[in-house]
Every structure is written in structure tokens, then in C-alpha cells.
Amino acid sequence: MKISVNWLKDFLPSFSPDITSLVEKLTFLGLEVEDVESTPLPDLRVVVGRVQSVALHPDADRLRICMVDTGLEEPLQIVCGAPNVAEGMLVPVATEGSRLTMQDGTSFVIKPSKIRGQRSFGMICAADELGLSADHSGVMELDSSYAVGEPFARYLDSDTVLDIAVTPNRPDVLSHLGIARELGSAPDAILFPEEAPLEFSADSPLVQVMDSGACPLYVGVIIRGVTVGPSPRWLSARLESIGLRPKNNIVDITNFILHALGQPLHAFDLQKLKGGRVIVRSDFSGSFTTLGAEQCTVEPGMPVICDTQMPVALAGVMGGLDSAVGEGTVDILLEAACFAPSAVRRSARKAGISSDSSYRFERGIDIRNVLPAARAAVALILETAGGTVGEATLQGDPSPALLVLPFRPRRANELLGTAIETDAMQAMLARIGFRTLALDEGVMQVEVPSCRIDVLQEIDLIEEVARLHGYDNIEASGRLAATYPASRTRPGYFPDFLRGVAVGLDFREVLTNPLIRREEAAPFGDGLVSVLNPISEGLEVLRPGLVPGMLKVIAHNIRHGNRDMRLFEVAHGFSVADPSGAAEQGPLGAYCEKEWLVLALTGNRYPRSWNQPPDRVDFYDAVGAAEMLLGKLNLLDKSAVNIYNENTVSIDLELTEGKKKRSQRAGRAMRLDSALLSQFGIEQDVFTVELDVSVLEMLYSPDVVYDPPSKFPAVQRDLSFILPGTVPVQSLVGLVRSSDPLIRDVSVFDVFERGSGGGGERSVGLSISIADHSGTLQEGRISEILRTVGVNAESKLGAVIRQV
């Protein structure tokens, strides 16, 4: 963004800075100055001249022979090729010996010459030939305030232009007024342009806003009887100083207000508006021609300004060619509006158009600045183009309530490591427009100016204090002191604890985007949460879970040659709480947000080696990983793995509520379907474990009770059971383990299927470890325990001990 130092003086009359100090001050305020350009004054031998006559060149159709009065006894003959040179014009004339420095930095000296056989004793100059701007469309036309024969430089002020890099969160400084606010000692010291008194009507048919979400405020002013023509020199000079080419007085004023006050404006030729009115709508589908003479396709969701028949502007982005102000314009409709940043961003992206207006609307403008900017523009139009104000209408609230934030000076000093007095902080904030409404028990109530849409909470105010105090004035501390509790609270700690456990199990963490394509999310649920304003067409829904993102990571790695992976992620999934809308809404309204831990395994179980063949991971690796993780959380004894189908098992945890116990679903382990994997371009098996973090945290207990091993020898007994095919082996293992307190461990050493499809009987071999802390086990006690095991298995599960 280019800022003219001379233009800044319009807002700060006493402003006379040293440029080096100014650049340093802006930098410390967080506004990086990328470039500094000084505009030198033209050579004193460049004088004001009057074109007395213009004749065609006898040997060149595009050249003219001009006789120019420069205050000397005889007029100078000058050959000129500018298309706009005309008799009676006041122009800058470079006389013999003048050294001209162009806009690009090159220079040359004017000498008498012959051009196509005709003598020329000087040059009538365009703006770029004097280094004033990049405009080379024609010679400069001066107004009547210039005196013939006077050095042109006497009418100019040397200027310095700063090119400032503005971060996206600071739209308030995208104007000369915004920079003046940063530099000013107080808001009252800033001079605002003169405003025209206007009476607005809220119920006029002139403007109809059909989408108030996209356009919360629209101001329209009709000015009749204007004369469209060249802008006065002061106005052209302001625009040229920042690299803009003047067009006509109406358009130049809209550009002037944009760069002066930061409020985009647009002027319509009222006679070209069908029905003499405008409608703001977002449901139009069609096309229109922009000011740049390009066809723009409009889709529903893109706000447009329409007359009664067709679009005349893409709201906040660019106007239309068919309603543009030109030389024949007599009546205009001046638009000053506030358009929603998301709506303008979407329109500009889809249309492929970027403009000074869209740049500001996309970042957010000051809604309270719309009316003052409109009044200032009307005053300038009446001054430079004449005319009278007709109807003025306003749709929306031009002065919404300001945000008030609590601010603790003590907290600011703690975070910044400073000892700034409360009065000093109050004065700093007041300097940039933050008013202190009250101060009670060390807490200030601070009113945020409407232009500072980036200040939303106390920490933002603390940042402002640091910025205004000066980061270089904050002394380095001799010691480090934490300003947060020594131990993190459990809700913030548990996900990190899970990450540590997963890393300890040889899984690697991935971080995936919560926004994904609708096609990627569709296989994982119906209640998808759509984003109203997606940042791109490929990121239009929130992920229902973590598996879609995990599969994208796996596919990416496989494409790059890495086929063996053990990955995990802890993050949130999102869904509509009840897609049918019948259920009562929860704390998040119609939406559900849940935190998940997902493990994913694919490829070989072990790294490739000379001493063992490749061994692929399988379903039991996933279940085993889940059990190991539950073991680290002291939840393995409370867990049960239940078969859901041949590719999926549920993982349930035992929950105690008073004297009752119930099963709580914690997650699942599964082998992903090959058809699903093919959608992501994966041709090898992938196994996943999904665990609900809230359930794990609810049941997790960090307290571990030490159970010492028995001093007496343990006894191992192997039993073989005939188990119905419908009963999970896990149920048998759990039942045997709970049959007697002396049973220390139960493990499966053999499974033999007698039937197919999971419906037949199975032979399951269990190894049972029995130990007593009080003494050596006797055979009678061992036999009693095994009989109890057999009775429980047969009565509760239908499992029979197989006799050998």
C-alpha cells in the first residue's frame, strides 16, 4: 500500500517528519515499510505554457505542430504527438536545457531537434516525463491557477511515498486516515474532510437490500446536474502520487475517498439504471460486463448490485461497464456500503477479479465510517462537478454498538514483564481511539473503536499496549518466570498423555486438515457439517472423523514410496447431532463435536530384513495395539472386544455407576473395505482403531496398585473348551479369569474352527495360571478351581471342557 507523506499532512497539519524517523516509528508500530520513494521537483526550466495554436504535421498523421507561449517574446514551436493537445491548454513545457527525470528513473536533456523535417524547440510534458506518475496517456492539462512563464516546480511540493506492508488483521490502516491514526497524538488532532449535510430516508424505493447478511449497510445518494470532466490539479496530484491515473472528477473522487478514508465507493450513471433504482441480491445467475470490459459469470451466492433487469456491479468487487460514469453523465447514484468480508472474498475468488475495493472489503471495513465517507464524497463532487443533491437513502444500521472489553493493567504487566502505570496505559490506548469508560478495582472497561475489528479480547489490548510502549523499550528479564500454572489442567493434559502413549507404542503422529471434500467424507456418515464459506471448493465440509484424513496421508506416503506405516492422530470430528432434526439440540446446537484417537496400520509388520520374510500386519495387530494402549491407561481389565462383523470389532469398557455396572462403547477396530480404500487410491490393506477420548478420560485412573508376585510357585493348567461359534473367545477368557481370585492370568494358545462362516463350534485352548500368596497350592484346591471354571463356562456360555 502506497502512502504519500504530503497526503498525511491533510490529516495531521503539524506533521513534519524526518523520513528516517518516520520509517522507524512505523516499523516499531508493526507496519513494515518495504520501500521509500522520493519525488524530486522538476527542473526549473520546465515552465507553464499556453498552447496558442495546433496544426497538423505535413509528414506525419499522428504529430502536431504547436505554437506555445512560455512568457518569452516569441512563442516556441514544439512538435507534439499527444492525442489530447489542444489550443488554449495550459501545459508544462520543458524548454531547451531542461533535464527531465522519468518515472522509471531514466533522464535526458531537452535540445532543439528536427522531427520529420520540422523544428522543435522544447517538449510539452506528460506526467511520467516529469516523474510525477506513470501516466503517459497524454500531456498534462493544468488549470487556470497556473501562470504562464512561471516554473512548474513552484506549484508542486516535493513528496515522499512509502510502500507499507499491511498484515491481514489490520484493515484499519489501509488508508491515509488509518496511518494518521497510528501516528497522531490523539484522535481529536486528526482533521477529517469536509462533509456535506445530508438527510437520509430509510424507506426509500431507491435501494432494496434483499440479502442483509451480505450487505448490512447500504447508502445511496442521487446527485443531479453534475458536469463530468478532468479533476482539479490537487486531486489529480494526490492520486498520481500513489501511482493512480486520473480519469474524471467523479471517478477520481471515489478513488480519493478510498485511499484517504479507507471506504470504497462507486458511482453509477443514474440514466443507465433500468427503473432508476438498485437491488442488492445474492440469488442472481447470469453474466455481466465489468468496467474492465470482461465478461463475469455470476452464480447464486455471489452478491450483486442490480437494477430492475440486470446486474450493474459485482458487490464490493467491481462495477459494470453498462452503468459506468462517462462524459455524457448528468445524474449519478453514489454508493457507499458495507459488504460482508466472506461474501466479497467468495465473489472475487470465483470471478477471478481483485480490486482495491475487494482488497479492503475482504479484510473488513469500519461500518461507522460509511456515512462520513459518503458525506465527504458528496461535498467533493458538489465542489468539483457541481450539481445538487437529490434523494439520499440508507438501509441498515450505520452505528452499531461498540465492543467493550475488560482490561487488567496488572495482567498486562505480568505478561509483558513491564511496570507501566495504569494512567500511562490508559493514555496509550486513548491515543489510538480506545476510550476508558470505567476503572474499578484494577479493571478498566475499554471501548474499542469501530475501525479496530481485530481487537476482540483482553490479550489484544495487551498487545496494543506493548506495541505503543515499544517492543524495544521492554527490557529483557534476568530470569524466566512462568505466568501459567505449574501443572496443566487435566482436560488439556489428557490428549497429550495419549499422544505420549501412542508414540511409546511406535506410532507416528500426523496432523490433518479438519476441512475435506464432500466426496471423501460421504462414506463415513450422513450428518455432514457443511461450511457456509469454504476457503476452496475442495474444503467444503468438516470431517466426520479422523479416518478420511488418515487415508489421505497414507495414500500420499504410498505414492512417495513409503508403504509401511503405523500412524496416529488425536483431533476432533464433527457431525450434525441429528440429521433428521427430530432430537433436542445439545450444547453445540444442532452439531456434535467429539475428540478421537485413531491408530492406523498398513504394510509390513517389521522392517525389511535379510533374516526374516516379509510379514504383513493384520486385523489382530490393530486389536493388539488397542489392547496395549488400554493397558497403558489401566483399562485393559475393564475392556471387552466384541465381534461386530468379520472386519470390525467393538471395544467396550466397563462403567460403574453406584452399585450397577454397564458397558460403555469406547470405539472400534476394523479392516477398511477395499472399495473405500480404492477411492483414496490405496491398494493394500489398512487397519484402524478409533477410540473416543472422552470415554477414555472418564474411566482413566492414574493410580496404580502394586500387586507383588506370590512367594509360592504358580501352577499352570491347560484346558480345551468346545465353544459355540457365536460366543466371542474374549467372553470365555473374561469368564475364566473372574471365576476365582487365585487365577492370575488366562491366555489363548489354540483356536480350531469346526464350522465355516462363524456359526459352527470352535475348540479353544486356554492356559490358566493359578497362584496363592498365602501358601503352596494343594491339588485339591486346584481341582476345585478348575471345576468352578468348567461349571461357569457351561452354565453361562454353553462352553464344555473337551475331554482328551
Swiss-Prot record:
FDX-ACB domain residues: 710-802
Protein name in UniProt: Phenylalanine--tRNA ligase beta subunit
EC number(s) on file: 6.1.1.20
Pfam families: B3_4, B5, FDX-ACB, tRNA_bind, tRNA_synthFbeta
Cofactor binding note of this UniProt entry: Binds 2 magnesium ions per tetramer.
HAMAP family for this protein: Phe_tRNA_synth_beta1
Binding annotation for Mg(2+): D454, D460, E463, E464
GO molecular function: ATP binding; magnesium ion binding; phenylalanine-tRNA ligase activity; tRNA binding
Gene from which this protein is expressed: pheT
Gene Ontology terms describing biological process: phenylalanyl-tRNA aminoacylation
Location of the B5 domain: 400-476
Subcellular location: Cytoplasm
Subunit and partners: Tetramer of two alpha and two beta subunits.
tRNA-binding domain segment(s): 40-153
Organism: Chlorobium luteolum (strain DSM 273 / BCRC 81028 / 2530)
Keywords: Aminoacyl-tRNA synthetase, ATP-binding, Cytoplasm, Ligase, Magnesium, Metal-binding, Nucleotide-binding, Protein biosynthesis, RNA-binding, tRNA-binding
Annotated catalysed reactions: tRNA(Phe) + L-phenylalanine + ATP = L-phenylalanyl-tRNA(Phe) + AMP + diphosphate + H(+)
